[in-house]
From Swiss-Prot:
The keyword Phosphoprotein does not apply. Pfam families: PRAI (PF00697). GO terms for molecular function: phosphoribosylanthranilate isomerase activity. InterPro entries: Aldolase_TIM, PRAI_dom, RibuloseP-bd_barrel, TrpF_fam. This is N-(5'-phosphoribosyl)anthranilate isomerase. The gene is trpF. It comes from Pseudomonas putida (strain W619).
Amino acid sequence: MSNVRSKICGITRIEDALAAAEAGADAIGFVFYAKSPRAVDVRQARAIMAELPPFVTTVGLFVNASRCELNEILEAVPLDLLQFHGDETPADCEGYHRPWIKALRVRPGDDLEAACRHYAGARGILLDTYVAGVPGGTGEAFDWSLVPSRLSKPIILAGGLSAGNVGQAIAQVRPYAVDVSGGVEQAKGIKDAAKIEAFMRAVKQA
């Protein structure tokens, strides 16, 4: 049985958040990026969080948000963890009194250990698929052999994961956690409870 943690990202509906919690997800993610088909506003996020059972970590995903915008959201939504998914510098990620992780879009030749050191304050590094001009949510997997066997920060593996490949991904990369969005959807922003359950079962059996 795997002890790899899991996050279901791109939650937009209460029923999807509850399905994730029921299936055993450790965290759910809210996308505060207006260009995403999975974007939520403050009102939606608050309503969903009000229905969550305890011990489910709430993560806010941001893409090059201004400090003013991010502070306004944090005043209204009590997020547990921040995920920076754009071109943010380490300084951009600090100062919010929340733990944070930094997403990197992986390309051949990237020095991921150098990136871990660069984002020294991050609690973990999320590795996602590189597609030019797209910050994330591509639904495509990347070449997992690009991930070194040892890195100095916990690794959250994302990018094209599903119930069909997450077991292989865990076996190959040995991440701290996995992150899924499109792989458990029936449409963008609309999750499928059966796919969530199948994904979580595959994670636990890995």
